[in-house]
A protein has these predicted regions:
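Conserved N-terminal phosphate-binding loop of PLP-dependent enzymes in the Aspartate aminotransferase
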Residues: 1-402
Length: 402
């Protein structure tokens, strides 16, 4: 790819693509947004990096705005989402300690409960709480003290919860797992069990947060809040920046030097992130996300009635999964050939993560292109056929693709 503008990218030959993947939820304002470009140019000429030994004009105001959006009290900036996951795990272990626990000895509260089908990142802590085996098993043994709970199963959560649990870690909407929202019943039980047992509820909103679902944060559709919220992806409009948002009760247990970062919270990234948040507010993008998301849901519903290999449409704002009964990879390739960028996750779910700024006309353009893709793509193996082939002699290569 050569460059982008708005909801489009262009390759080196000049071919134009409608970008409905957005750097996997990073380019929430599309490409080359004029206000973002202006801030990058201005601040790059002043100070790109200073280190966290010194104050600069943007980190404090950004932290205040994130606290305002989320209802949290404190913010710790990081380089990325996966670093935010690892940092949150450290804070949860710290919160589980008591003054009587000798340093270097495991606290009674040290276990994590994470969800089946989850993905939290690729650093060592993050893969330890990632259920998807292809990301975790090659690096075993991983961090001990992690158990996986059946997705949206409050009874299984309750059965696995005890006094040794320091935190429940979940994606409010599973992204890599195929766009699966946590149910209200599961969230409420996780919140109540964590509160009853003195554990933490940690919401990974790295992909679904900061407006993606039509709310500032996906958990805001529930009546209760988590103890920590983890964000990254769109925060600095394409520059690397993540954050842990947390309550005062959790943050107050951290003393200077317990955790740190080299690049997290630098002046350039924070200045851009502040501008991103301002654009979301001033351009009323939450309204656009909800409106365009509903148009996409309705249009995809019509296509589902035409193509019987579409099993289900799952949508939260502009975070959309199209589950197929056949493998999705060929559809991704056909879409790219026709000038449309999407991707496939978990083999059978096409994932759409368009920018917050898409227009009604661009939604119509997508639906027209996507209908052609569905009609023209040669139909690959169905889910049941793929499962059978995985156990036939000579099919090891297919299973290895994961």
């Amino acid at each position: 790819m050569s460059h982008g503008h708005g909801a489009y990218v262009f390759d080196a030959t000049g071919k134009k693509y409608l970008d409905f993947l957005g750097g996997i939820a990073v380019n929430a304002l599309g490409h080359a947004h004029a206000r973002i470009v202006k801030v990058i140019r201005r601040e790059a000429a002043r100070a790109i990096h200073l280190s966290n030994l010194y104050h600069h004009p943007f980190q404090g105001p950004l932290a205040r705005k994130l606290a305002e959006w989320s209802g949290m009290d404190r913010v710790f900036f990081s380089n990325s989402g996966t670093e935010a996951i690892d940092g949150a795990m450290k804070l949860a272990r710290l919160a589980g300690r008591t003054p009587a626990t000798p340093l270097g000895r495991p606290a009674e509260k040290h276990r994590f409960l994470a969800l089946e089908n989850s993905f939290h990142g690729r650093t060592f802590g993050a893969i330890s709480v990632t259920a998807t085996e292809k990301y975790r098993l090659p690096f075993a043994p991983v961090v001990p003290g992690v158990e996986f709970v059946r997705f949206n199963d409050p009874a299984d959560l309750e059965a696995k919860f005890d006094a040794t649990v320091c935190a429940v870690l979940l994606e409010t909407v599973q992204g890599e797992g195929g766009i699966h929202p946590v149910s209200e019943a599961f969230w409420d039980r996780a919140r109540s069990l964590a509160s009853e047992h003195g554990a933490l509820l940690i919401a990974d909103e790295i992909q679904c947060g900061l407006g993606r679902t039509g709310r500032y944060f996906a958990y805001q559709k529930f009546a209760s809040k988590p103890d920590m919220v983890l964000i990254a992806k769109p925060l600095a409009a394409g520059l690397p920046l993540g954050a842990i948002l947390t309550t005062e009760a959790v943050a107050s247990q951290v003393s200077p030097g317990m955790h740190g970062t080299t690049f997290g919270g630098g002046p350039l990234a924070c200045a851009v992130a502040l501008e991103f948040l301002s654009i979301v507010e001033e351009e009323r993008l939450l309204e656009n996300i909800r409106a365009r998301g509903e148009e996409l849901r309705e249009g995809l519903g019509r296509l589902a009635s035409q193509f019987d290999f579409i099993r289900e449409i799952r949508a939260e704002g502009l975070m959309i999964g199209i589950e197929l009964s056949v493998e999705g990879g060929p559809f991704v390739a056909e879409a790219m050939e026709r000038g449309l960028l999407i991707n496939c996750t978990h083999d059978f779910t096409l994932r759409l993560l368009p920018p917050f700024v898409i227009t009604r006309a661009e939604v119509r353009e997508f639906l027209k292109l996507f209908e052609t893709v569905l009609a023209k793509t040669p139909k690959p193996a169905s889910a049941s056929e793929a499962a059978k082939s995985a156990i036939l002699p000579g099919a090891a290569h297919a299973a290895a693709r994961g």
